[in-house]
């Protein structure tokens, strides 16, 4: 039986060992190297495939992150502190005004500071129906303010207006004044953080935006400047002129309404934008020339009525700035503001 089976078995032919000579050494070397390539190339292929897979995973992850971020910011309108930090890094728009992007970070900064003040300082409960209406109102006002800042940035380029670091520091110095003197920068930063949740960088940015809008408003309003020049001429011609009568006369038949205010006795350090400080420089009955207060809302003329060591009594007239608000209203009415989020009107609820 074994003999029969052996007939059908294929015997493996044993290759006789070949001798390595000087003539065959190159052939043997190539045969050995070829045998090693099967171990080398699979590793190279695996590395190449690993790189491709890593790129694909990274792209997919990036798309997912961007999609989730877009969904959180626009459809959901996530207003968390985390999303604010994201928008500070990524300059995403929340709207456009006359082609100028309105940054989402500016909108959130204004919104979050107001919410922070209500919750931490006013101890307001924003989860009630009234609180929810307050939230919607704050969203509307924050959007309006952010749009106005963005429009001011657009006009600043055309008017060649800018804010320097010295302007910002001067504003800081004015805002740090108190009845007991100037508070420190650290104290001011602590107050801003406690009241509004602003870091020092946030406060710097807010101040820069405010000053730029003021400068644009002054540069744009030629009518207010002309009115101010006319009042200056009248005061020079009649130093004892009655400011109340002057304001009434100039307002009659004019598109600009000159405001008149009497202060009564107030501290010389009264936080009124610098009006009391300006009045303290005058002699009794003297009227100042035009000056721009820290509020940045017009040209002021102040007259000192009386004073003592710590207080002043004064009256003043104000030439308001209207051109910027008029220009912004025109842009809005012409449909040149596009908002990328929907904010319900709280007045309709």
List the model feature ranges, each with a label:
Residues 1-133, 274, 278-284, 294, ...:
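Short, low-structural-confidence N-terminal segments
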Residues 234-277, 306-313:
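Peptidyl-prolyl cis-trans isomerase
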Residues 189-218, 271-318:
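Proteostasis/folding factors centered on peptidyl-prolyl cis-trans isomerases
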Residues 90-98, 103, 157-159, 212-214, ...:
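Envelope-exposed proteins and targeting segments
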Residues 313-333:
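A short, surface-exposed interaction/processing loop segment used at functional sites
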Residues 112, 116-119, 143-164, 168, ...:
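Sec-exported extracytoplasmic/periplasmic mature domains
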Residues 70, 78-79, 89-93, 100, ...:
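Low-complexity segments enriched in small/polar residues
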Residues 81-198, 202:
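N-terminal targeting/tethering segments
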